Amino acid sequence: MPGLFITATGTAVGKTWLTRALARNLVRRHHTVAALKPIETGVVSEALDAVAIARASGQPEDAELPSLYRSAPALAPWSLTLRGDHDPLIMDPLVAMISTRGRESEWLLVEAAGGILVPLTERATNADLAAVLGLPLVMVAKDELGTLSHTLTAMESAQRRGLEVAAVVLMQSAPDAGAGSNHDVLSRMLAPTPVLAFRQTEDDDDALADEAERCGLMALLLGD
């Protein structure tokens, strides 16, 4: 079962956009895809990120599977537990649900909640969830001033845990002083891990799928 764990240097850097891009591109290639965001906080009426990636995969019901973790306060699960805002996250049923959907599909895409070391429980982080699932990472970072340290720190955390990183993807939106040079620096410092630049422009699943093609991500993942 091919799959990816889409994580990041932090929150609000473009993971959902990238997951939508991957899901729609794979669907256009006639693959069945389970695109899941098993943990999502900041949920008011519906889990917007989970809904968006499930729709992009053509499986909208994946946003409402049992054992998904949802919370209104936009905090890490362990923070919510400490505050008494949510029951502790139980990893085993979450992992079982993700694994089941993965076995039912040709591709499994799991979008993390926030960055690589977001605490899910007292002892487990997103990195631990990725390790249990056995999925290679796609590390998403925002192409802006300051991302060098953020990305190198996140990558060091992943590598120290023995996690495979398939690619680093720099999400480019508004012009920024660090944009452009970040790619050059990270490509050299993180070699042989590929570093790709994804233009985050049009909010449309098919346009995002096209960009995943243009930036070389699909060729990298599929060996095209």
Predicted feature locations:
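Hydrophobic anchor at the beta1->P-loop junction of P-loop NTPases
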Residues: I6-T7
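Conserved catalytic-core segment of NTP-binding enzymes
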Residues: A12, L22-A23, A112-P192, L196-A197
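N-terminal phosphate/diphosphate-binding loop that engages ATP/GTP or pyrophosphate donors
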Residues: G3, W17-P88, D92, M97-T100
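C-terminal binding/interaction regions
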Residues: N182-G223
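Short, charged/polar "capping" segments at the starts of alpha-helices
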Residues: V43-V44, P175-G180, D205-D206
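Switch II (G3) loop of P-loop NTPases
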Residues: L94-T121
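Beta-strand->loop->alpha-helix junctions that form or flank phosphate-binding loops
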Residues: K37-E40, E64-Y69, V168-M171, S187, ...
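Short coil/turn connectors at secondary-structure junctions
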Residues: M1-P2, R29-T32, P60-E61, R103-E106, ...
